[in-house]
Amino acid sequence: MTKRILLVLCGLLAIALWAPQARAADRFEVTSIKAVRPTLVKTVDALQKNNPKGAREAFGEYDSAWNGIEVYINTRSKVMYDALEHDMQATLTAKLAESTPNLPDLLPLAKSMLATFDQAIIMVEKGQPLNPLYDDVARLRIVRAHLREVNPALRTGDIVKARKSFGEFDEKWDSIEDLVKDRDVKAYATIEDGMTNIGLALKQATPDVAKVQTLVSGVMDEYNKIVAQVTKEARGQ
């Protein structure tokens, strides 16, 4: 009987120790940051294969995904944020933009960036949950990331990419539209109207690029107001 009680107590202790880790792993903050990691892995892989096009595409995916979740890292550690954003990412972006990038030289930097990103994941997993409003900020930014891709794609003449990115934004808009509507009904209506017009414009066989860019910028302006408002709320301002 005593042995059975000890086994039960040990089991309860193990559950108690494991539960906080499980809760941390399930947090939206943790899962969202981990979801970005594969884009860095793809970047490293492309560099190892001496594939500049693949590296640019993968790192472009990272940049877009990072924009969604960087608020978490910036809030928890300005030092780590600056290392990832202003040091390593800025350097890799500039070097990959060169006509003939020296990929072997960039590989160690990309690996270092991946290692730093892994440290960020550990930091977040071990940290206490932030104000839940930061999750709302991240949700807004994650969805917005797709809209941010549209105008750059149009500038390079990549209509297919512009349509794809807007389609992803349109699809994910439903997940956060109530967040926007609750803050500002007028902004919500403006965004909805703008999205309808963008969708129609992009359906044309040869879209009017200048018109679409103007429409996208208009939607972005209203959307950014909501992001700024929720960010202030999260910071208690």
Model-derived segments and spans:
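Bacterial N-terminal signal peptides
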Residues: 9-16
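Mature extracytoplasmic or organellar-lumen-exposed domains after removal of signal/transit peptides
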Residues: 24-237
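Sec/Tat signal peptide C-region and signal peptidase I cleavage site
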Residues: 18-24
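Bacterial N-terminal signal peptides that target proteins for export
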Residues: 1-9
